[in-house]
Structures are given as structure tokens and as C-alpha cells.
């Protein structure tokens, strides 16, 4: 079974990096959409109903925490992974309190041995 993934990040480079990662073929993931911020992403996520949303934490219009809150309220089955350039524990604590499954610091690598 393919897991559907949706990416939300205001920067193009992280979206391209995730999109081009080798994990898609190896782990049975399929990319179903992407958006530059939470405000644009939310209706797209409601339409696509992905299994996993990978989101940045700081974005214009609707940040990753607000997006996570909205997703968990209306689509609680969706797993959320936050990618953040901020190591401030306050962001991680907020994410955990919202039910976010993973909080990873950028840059993220898929290479073995990390």
C-alpha cells in the first residue's frame, strides 16, 4: 500500500529535496501535492486526504503549528512531520501538544549512519 504524502514549505529547496529523495521508491510513499504555506495547503489537504503531511514550522499566512492544529482538529488520522530550522524547544513542545508525530531539525539527511 502506498502512503500518500503532502509537503508544505515556503522555500522551494526543501520541497525539491524531499521530492527528489530516494525514499519514494524504497518505502512505498507517493507525493500527492505540495504548497508554499498552510493557508494554501489546508484545502488541498482536505481534498487529497494524505496519510502524512510534512510541513515547515515558520511560513507566511499560516505557519506549521496553525496548520497542524487545523489538520488534527478536522483530519486527526493524518500523521504530521514538522521540519524546522529552529532548535528552540518551545516550538517542539507546542508541536507535541498538538499531536504532531515527528519534529525534525533541518537539514534532514536520508543517508545511513546518522
What are these regions (language model features)?
Residues 6, 11, 57-58:
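The short loop immediately C-terminal to the conserved phospho-acceptor aspartate in CheY-like receiver
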Residues 8-9, 35, 53:
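Conserved sequence signature across two-component system core domains
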Amino acid at each position: 500500500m502506498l502512503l500518500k504524502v503532502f509537503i508544505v514549505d515556503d522555500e522551494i529547496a526543501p520541497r525539491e529535496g524531499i521530492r527528489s529523495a530516494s525514499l519514494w521508491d524504497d518505502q512505498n510513499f507517493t507525493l500527492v501535492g505540495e504548497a508554499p504555506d498552510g493557508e494554501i495547503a489546508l484545502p488541498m489537504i482536505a481534498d487529497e486526504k494524505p496519510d502524512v503531511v510534512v510541513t515547515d514550522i515558520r511560513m507566511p499566512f499560516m505557519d506549521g503549528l496553525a496548520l497542524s492544529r487545523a489538520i488534527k482538529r478536522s483530519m486527526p488520522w493524518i500523521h504530521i512531520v514538522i521540519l524546522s530550522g529552529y532548535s528552540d524547544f518551545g516550538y517542539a513542545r507546542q508541536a507535541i501538544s498538538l499531536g504532531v508525530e515527528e519534529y525534525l531539525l533541518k537539514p534532514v539527511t536520508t543517508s545511513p549512519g546518522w
